[in-house]
Regions:
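Short glycine/proline-enriched loop/turn "hinge" motifs that connect secondary-structure elements
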Residues: 81-89, 125-127, 185-190, 238, ...
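Glycine-rich, often proline-containing surface loops adjacent to acidic residues and nearby aromatics
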Residues: 88-95, 191-198, 242-246, 328-330
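Gly/Pro-rich turn-and-neighbor structural signature
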Residues: 206-209, 218, 225-234
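Short, conserved phosphate-binding/catalytic loop or strand-edge motifs used
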Residues: 132, 136, 188-196
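Active-site-proximal beta-alpha loop/turn segments in soluble metabolic enzymes
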Residues: 148-158, 191-206, 235-240, 252-257
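ATP/Mg2+-dependent ligation/transfer catalytic cores
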Residues: 1-184, 206, 226, 381-443
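A generic structural motif
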Residues: 27, 97-103, 160, 200-206, ...
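Catalytic-core signal marking the mid-to-C-terminal active-site face
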Residues: 212, 219-222, 226-227, 251-443
Length: 443
């Protein structure tokens, strides 16, 4: 049941003195876009009459079919707390429609909605809890981003070591004011690194909340004279920033992943779900870890997974079964990072897990030892494989995975792969500072 009607939104906008509305949507690569309108145009927007040029976005449409429509999701109406309180600014997240009046198949929000519909057809609803990590750095005299921090804090430290504590508190309070429930917030391992953990929510709401959170975090950071970055590995020699995703599955109020008679408390559906994730993870990585820089995080020694395995407690594998305060069984995927488009990341992970349930894909046995301590022979015997080691490798794996290509749509995949291959080849052509320092004077 919808939370808001058109009439309710128009009334709220008038009562709250809203003068400006941002119609937001997300492009193929997870970048938030928006069209701004005045309150006088709000009724037109709510009647789905706002048009934009889709040909101006990479991977959308050609110039011959450029006109596209924004259809606001009424339940996403929210006032932006950091904007002026006289003449307020609100936002609506929108679905993208083509000129024929159809949901645009290459829109990432549409792709996620298709997977949600498939889950509902199987009788399932997802609850997802993300853990979003990011860095806060100082800005230069012109307000530009740097990679400098005077923060000396470590994991769970507090002030005065944690210099970002006030900014992080304001971020949490801002998100709460927008109706987003934050479970916890704290300083992470690296200097200047922070984490916000969100309460479980339905899949589409989770993706919307992640996009909103990134927008709000950057905005609040700027107000504190800081720059927030979700770059997976912004500095050499420190822990990178991830986006751990914990998936729960519900059917008619029942915890689908739970079975008290099992050694690990897991149902057969939970095992199959993990099996599906592990089967498709090499191609999934091109979506959940979408940057060249993503694979600088997925290296040994910094707490990020590089091995395809699962455990009920061990944090070194790709998947673990976390302890939850509410007793609901969850499956945590540890490889994604916050550079990912959340709509696409959730879509491919959910679809892969559902494929595992449908195909009854049984995962290998759990690994409760630190995988880095195992020999190659031991890993092979335990069926432990590696995640892709680069964006180029992950994109090649996505190309080969017919199931994921079907989930995303071949037209979308072709555009996405073309862009990511171009990004990878551009990187390969670069001569880095490391190479110059290593070789210039002695070769």
């Amino acid at each position: 049941m919808a939370k808001y009607t058109k009439e309710a939104i128009l009334q709220m906008a008038e009562e709250e003195d809203v003068e400006f509305i941002r119609l937001q949507f997300t492009d193929m690569f997870g970048t938030m876009k928006n069209m701004a309108i005045t309150a006088g145009q709000l009724e037109k927007a709510l009647n789905n009459q706002c048009v934009f040029d889709g040909s101006s976005f990479e991977g959308f449409v050609t110039i011959e079919e450029a006109d596209m429509f924004l259809h606001p999701d009424l339940d996403t109406f929210a006032i932006l707390p950091w904007r002026p309180q006289q003449g307020k600014v609100a936002r609506l997240i929108c679905d993208v429609y083509d000129r024929e009046g159809n949901l645009y198949a290459k829109s990432s929000r549409t792709i996620l909605q298709k997977v949600i519909f498939e889950a509902k057809a199987m009788g399932y609803e997802f609850e997802i809890s993300p853990e979003c990590e990011f860095f806060l750095f100082h800005t230069d005299e012109d307000g530009g981003a740097t990679s400098v921090t005077h923060d000396k804090g470590g994991y769970l430290d507090l002030g005065p070591l944690d210099l970002g504590e006030n900014a992080r508190r304001d971020m949490v309070l801002t998100l709460e004011e927008m109706g987003i429930d934050v479970e916890s917030s704290f300083h992470e391992v690296a200097a200047g690194q922070h984490e916000l953990d969100f309460c479980p929510a339905a899949a589409l709401r989770t993706a919307d909340q992640l996009m909103t959170a990134k927008f709000a975090i950057r905005t609040i950071a700027k107000r504190h004279g800081l720059h927030a970055t979700f770059m997976p590995k912004p500095k050499t020699g420190v822990h990178g920033s991830g986006l751990h995703l914990s998936f729960s599955l519900v059917q008619e109020g029942k915890d689908v992943f739970a079975d008290k008679s099992d050694e690990y408390g897991l149902s057969k559906e939970a095992y199959y779900f993990m099996g599906g994730l592990m089967k498709h993870i090499s191609g999934i990585a091109a979506i959940t870890n979408p940057l060249v820089n993503s694979y600088k995080r997925l290296t040994p020694g910094y707490g990020a997974p590089i091995y395809v395995a699962w455990s009920a407690k061990n944090r070194s594998p790709l998947i673990r079964i976390p302890l939850t305060g509410d007793g609901i069984m969850a499956i945590e995927l540890r490889c994604p990072d916050s550079a990912a488009n959340p709509y696409l990341a959730l879509a491919v992970c959910m679809a892969a897990g559902l494929d595992g349930i449908k195909q009854k894909i049984v995962p290998p046995s759990p690994v409760d030892r630190n995988i880095s301590d195992l020999t190659e022979e031991e890993r092979n015997a335990m069926q432990i494989t590696l995640l892709p080691g680069s964006l180029g490798e992950a994109v090649a794996e996505l190309k080969k995975d017919d199931f994921l290509c079907q989930v995303l749509g071949q037209e979308f995949v072709d555009g996405y792969i073309n862009a990511k291959e171009e990004e990878w080849h551009e990187y390969l052509r670069q001569v880095s500072d490391w190479e110059t320092e290593k070789y210039l004077y002695r070769i």
